[in-house]
Amino acid sequence: MEFGVFDHLDRYGGALADYYEDRLKIAEAYDRAGFHAYHLAEHHSTPLGMAPSPSVFLAAVAERTRRLRFGPLVWPMPLHHPLRLIEEICMLDQLSGGRLDIGFGRGAAPIELEYYGVAPQDAQEIYAEAVELVIKGLTHKVLDFKGRRFSFSGVPMELEPLQKPHPPIWYGLHAPESAERAARRGLNVVSLDPTNEARLAIERYRTIWRQVHAPASALPKLGLGRFIVVAPSDAAALAKARRAYLVWHESFTHLFRRHGRAQSHPRPASFDLLTERGQGIAGSPATVAEFLARELSATGCNYVVGQFAFGDLTLTESLQSIGLFASEVMPLLRAKAAVGAKEMAGVAAHGRR
């Protein structure tokens, strides 16, 4: 059982330079605590995302950490030129000693695409072609490509990734249909959706995976993304989470309210409603571990992705939450996972008799 982190890098006020420094201190804490990877969102012209260029912030993360893997979740491909992205991927992977993960998407916020002059209805086609192009560029010395959106002939690929054939690829799940595409390609995935929706997508992923890949193939990471606040008591954790989530939600809905549009992927307006939908938990280590164990069992995910820094949570509050999660929640969940694996092995052995 491994654990990751998801971060919007959402702003709540104060000097921006101080904010970045605090977030880098939090990244150092993730590294010390033994988290597997740090997954960073990309957003534009909104307080929801203070990392409109994930590569820049991730380069700083690479410098401040030693073991933590990291990467975008996701790069919205219609907003990135594929050739430049190929070069950035190679640089980040080499600079970090091969700790980069890469995530691609079409862009979840139509308003942000429109700011860049991209028609939302074109996003899927651009995404599909750009991803194919980037993977080809990472695995060939010379890039030749002809598509509807991009065409290149004889472009030398002077840079190369350290990880071969390329860094691990991630995709954000929102529906069973996207799960099917990801499973066929063997991508790692993360779902931020409510319990039942995540379950349906992960079930579809596992079904297609078994049909397409060899039985001995290692199952990719199936991530369960959840807001998490840990404190010594349930009451203390809830008070922090309720306060901070309201601030985060203001940032999340900022562009939609500004333009009078409905949210493309709505989130509940309160932390209590979020918890009812299975998308967040605040409590003592025991409470958080029990919740996550239920969610993992219900959805079929095998990788916990916590959002520990959001809204107006202070540096001290986030560091306390991360520390308690690492020292008390992680061991509880790993013990439960070990028991489950042992039981499954016993069932399999009995079936072979």
Language-model segments: which ranges?
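Short, acidic/polar
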Residues: 17-29, 173-180, 287-295
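Conserved, mostly hydrophobic/aromatic
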Residues: 3, 30, 34, 42, ...
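Acidic (Asp/Glu)-rich catalytic clusters
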Residues: 31-32, 58-66, 89-99, 183-184, ...
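Active-site mouth loops of central-metabolism enzymes
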Residues: 7-20, 75-83, 163-173, 276-285
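An alpha-helical appendage that flanks or caps ligand/catalytic pockets
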Residues: 122-157, 196-302, 334-353
